[in-house]
Amino acid sequence: MNINKQSPIPIYYQIMEQLKTQIKNGELQPDMPLPSEREYAEQFGISRMTVRQALSNLVNEGLLYRLKGRGTFVSKPKMEQALQGLTSFTEDMKSRGMTPGSRLIDYQLIDSTEELAAILGCGHPSSIHKITRVRLANDIPMAIESSHIPFELAGELNESHFQSSIYDHIERYNSIPISRAKQELEPSAATTEEANILGIQKGAPVLLIKRTTYLQNGTAFEHAKSVYRGDRYTFVHYMDRLS
């Protein structure tokens, strides 16, 4: 890297842009360790604080990650998720050539709240499956998913359902295909619990997704809240110009 101390462009920003270029062109590969802050500072004759600012910004953008006591490393490329199509997590990972998996955090059969009953269009009170899982890709935690599904639309559920695609089970159980979903996305920061589960730092960027999914007959069968790692996922929406 070359740093121009006479440039009006801040030094930390020059470091960021050059590291981005090295990551993009493959000079820096995923999981490759970077020199330490001290080494960068000595190499360019700048302060460690300036180096730390550049690296911290790239960590926040998901391009780098830190391991306590070991240093800073290059992140794996983010996976793009198109917002137009409706697929399950299992289907999505398989389409990428990855091995999907799930780890059950909690399961309860609960009584519906008024809010859930209104969203799902079920009676109140009625029995609701509440399933909280960590969704995995090649054994790497990608998201925390908490799903609420009316008992009458799923029947009894067991460990085998939690380890695979619940969407497949829902379609078989009801003999009706899944057709559409309403989805809301908003940025958030990982809580201590979320960070521990996902293997990221507390306060790291995450994507909070709320989704209500419907069968072809218009029946809402699931309301889910998911927390996706911001360093591994990016959501893309393609738009056509209206005539």
Swiss-Prot record:
Summarize which parts of the chain are annotated to bind DNA, as ranges. Answer: 37-56
UniProt keyword annotation of ATP-binding present:
no
Q: Which PROSITE patterns match?
A: HTH_GNTR
Induction per UniProt is: Expression is increased by growth on N-acetylglucosamine.
Q: Which UniProt keywords apply?
A: DNA-binding, Repressor, Transcription, Transcription regulation
According to the UniProt record, what happens if one changes residue 209 to L? No or little effects on GlcNAc6P binding
Q: Where does alpha-D-glucosamine 6-phosphate bind?
A: 89-90, 133-135, 145, 165-167, 222, 228
Q: Which InterPro entries match?
A: Bact_HTH_transcr_reg, Chorismate_lyase_/UTRA_dom_sf, Tscrpt_reg_HTH_GntR, UTRA, WH-like_DNA-bd_sf, WH_DNA-bd_sf
Relay the activity regulation note.
Binding to DNA is allosterically inhibited by an effector molecule. Binding of the effector to the C-terminal domain leads to a conformational change that modulates binding to DNA and thereby regulates transcription of the target genes. Glucosamine-6-phosphate (GlcN6P) and/or N-acetylglucosamine-6-phosphate (GlcNAc6P) are putative effectors of NagR. Binding of GlcNAc6P may prevent the protein-protein interactions responsible for polymerization along the DNA, but not the specific DNA binding.
Q: What residues bind N-acetyl-D-glucosamine 6-phosphate, as annotated?
A: 89-90, 133-135, 145, 165-167, 222, 228
The answer to whether the entry has keyword RNA-binding is no
Please provide the Gene Ontology terms (biological process) for this protein: negative regulation of DNA-templated transcription
Q: Which Pfam families match?
A: GntR, UTRA
**Which ranges carry the HTH gntR-type domain?**
9-77
What is the deletion mutant like?
Answer: Deletion of the gene results in the modulation of the expression of many important genes, probably indirectly due to an excess of the crucial molecules acetate, ammonia, and fructose-6-phosphate, resulting from complete hydrolysis of GlcNAc. Disruption of the gene induces a slight but consistent increase in MapB activity. Deletion of the gene improves the growth rate on N-acetylglucosamine.
Q: Which GO terms describe its molecular function?
A: DNA binding; DNA-binding transcription factor activity
Q: How does it assemble?
A: Homodimer. Forms dimers via the C-terminal effector-binding domain. At high concentrations, probably forms polymers along the DNA.
This molecule's function is given as: Main transcriptional repressor of genes involved in N-acetylglucosamine (GlcNAc) transport and utilization. Represses the expression of the nagAB and nagP operons by binding directly within their upstream regions. Binds to the DNA consensus sequence 5'-ATTGGTATAGACAACT-3'. Also acts as a weak repressor of mapB expression.
Provide the domain comment.
The N-terminal region contains a canonical wHTH DNA-binding domain. It is linked via a 21 residue-long linker to the C-terminal domain, which binds the effector molecule.
What is this protein's name?
Answer: HTH-type transcriptional repressor NagR
Organism field? Bacillus subtilis (strain 168)
